[in-house]
A protein has these predicted regions:
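Short, charge-patterned binding micro-sites
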Residues: 1-26, 55-58
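Short amphipathic alpha-helices in soluble, non-transmembrane regions
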Residues: 33-43, 78-87, 137-142
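Short glycine-/aliphatic-rich beta-strand segments at the starts of folded cytosolic domains
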Residues: 19-23, 63-71
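Helix N-cap motif at beta-to-alpha junctions
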Residues: 26-32, 72-76, 128
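A contiguous pocket-lining binding segment that forms or flanks enzyme active sites
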Residues: 66-101
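Glycine-rich, charged/polar anion/phosphate-binding loops
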Residues: 7-9, 51-57, 94-97, 106-109
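Core RNA-modification/binding signature centered on pseudouridine synthases
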Residues: 87-169
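Extended basic-aromatic, gly/pro-enriched interface segments that bind polyanionic ligands
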Residues: 41, 48-50
Length: 169
């Protein structure tokens, strides 16, 4: 029997360079390279398994997920307007019901870099069991408040960090 636990499942419409899944097997000495080859053989186009190995850190050590959000360069006006706000309340939908989260507590300012006709935002958001925030809260707020279409954002998860901001491996 195989038992699988997905840490921080990715939301629909988002991309990731770092997915992690813990697999528990009864095999005493699994051949990780064989697992990697077998998994890659059945993955959809564009999805590549880059590493299979013994657990180094338990999934509950994940505290933050870091993202790169790419918008058209014209989004700068909405981001500047967000930065000028004192408060940015959003409704977070969860298993225990909905609650209001103050985005400014977690993203006080949105820093961005413009490259040609795009701009990039690099940010880390809480991804712990106690509090898990999705970047779609920000993109949804920007759409609702400033008319910046959330669908114009490309959201790419880059890495996970522990509570002390070390790379989760």
């Amino acid at each position: 029997h195989i038992y699988m636990t997905f840490a921080c499942p990715l939301s629909l419409g988002q991309e990731s360079e770092c997915e992690c899944v813990d697999v528990k097997t009864e095999a005493e000495a699994p051949d990780f390279e064989q697992w990697k080859a077998a998994l890659n053989a059945i993955m959809p186009a564009g999805i590549v398994i880059t590493h299979v190995g013994p657990v180094q850190m338990k999934a509950d050590l994940i505290a933050y997920a870091c993202y790169r959000i790419t918008y058209p360069a014209a989004a700068a006006a909405a981001l500047d307007a967000y930065n000028a706000l004192e408060s940015a309340p959003v409704e977070k939908h969860g298993k225990k019901g909905n609650k209001i989260i103050e985005l400014k507590d977690h993203i006080p300012q949105v820093e961005y870099i413009t490259e040609g006709d795009s701009l990039h935002i690099d940010l880390c958001m809480p991804a712990a069991q106690e509090l898990n925030l999705n970047p779609s809260l920000l993109t949804g707020f920007l759409e609702e408040k400033f008319g910046l279409p959330a669908v114009s954002a490309n959201i790419l998860r880059k890495k996970f960090l522990t509570a002390d901001k070390q790379l989760f491996v």
